[in-house]
Amino acid sequence: MWEVLALRYARHDRTAQSNFMMPVPDPHDAMPMDYFVWLLRGPEGRLVLVDTGFSEETAAKRGRTILRPVGDCLRAIGVDPAAIQDVVVTHLHYDHAGNLDLFPNARFHIQDNEVSFATGRHMCSHCLRHPFEVQDVVRLIRAVYADRVVFHDGEGEVAPGVTLHGVGGHSGGLQMVRIATARGPLVIAGDASHYYANMARENPFPIVFDLGAMVQGWRRARALAGGDESLVIPGHDPLVRIRFPAEPGNPEATRLDLPPYS
């Protein structure tokens, strides 16, 4: 079985309407966004990282607040980034695929169609390329040429108990991660649902490439979790840190494999 830690590295203050496509009752209410990477600790000390966050340079460019750089988040729980051998990139948006150079010994797991999307004709449109940072995409392509990228076509496996599931929607090749844990099959939905409320209300986050695929992705996440929505983890919701216990001695690290408080 695997342990799963959500590591918060940044945040952004914003209003509720910024996080939904359709109108909400109180659009001006505060609804901040947290930014996470996820560390999976498996049998015999195996480590898998899900997503790589963004750099301080990108934070300044996009008006985000870094609380602790991703490398420092990992070191705070005793993990040397150079020791990580497998990194899952759920998609290539700036907040999920920066800092690739922090992981010189890792293989990067990504969907075929996400790389095609991020390097193809859709990037000729500003509205579609806005969530990407070109230097992040270039680093991924350099990793391809260095034989350090593992491509997946829909379903895939990173390690026993860690599987990948392509759903698209938010980005052309978004993938979710399913992890075998002591409390059941945990699903890192990531940006298939930024907040619990996106999925619960069926009101999508407004950055979306394929709306139909996003809606089907919510259903897929529930199914992968065996119908237990407490096992579906959204990509950016501050409620994650309220619902689950912190790693002892590190309040920015949250243990998702342990039972939620409620």
Question: Can you name each region flagged by the protein language model?
Answer:
Residues 1-30, 156, 249, 258-262:
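Basic, amphipathic N-terminal segments that precede the first structured/catalytic domain
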Residues 3-6, 37-42, 48, 153-182:
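Core dinuclear metal-dependent hydrolase active-site scaffold
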Residues 4, 40, 51, 84, ...:
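Divalent metal-coordination and catalytic microenvironments
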Residues 9-10, 52-54, 92, 113-114, ...:
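Active-site metal-binding loops of divalent metal-dependent hydrolases
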Residues 9-76, 176-190:
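Conserved beta-strand hairpin/beta-sheet module of binuclear metal-dependent hydrolase folds
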Residues 64, 68, 72, 176-262:
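Cap/insert and terminal regions of metallo-dependent hydrolase folds
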Residues 64-110:
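Active-site metal-binding motif and surrounding structural segment of the metallo-beta-lactamase
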Residues 68-79, 83, 113-166, 213-229:
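Metallo-beta-lactamase
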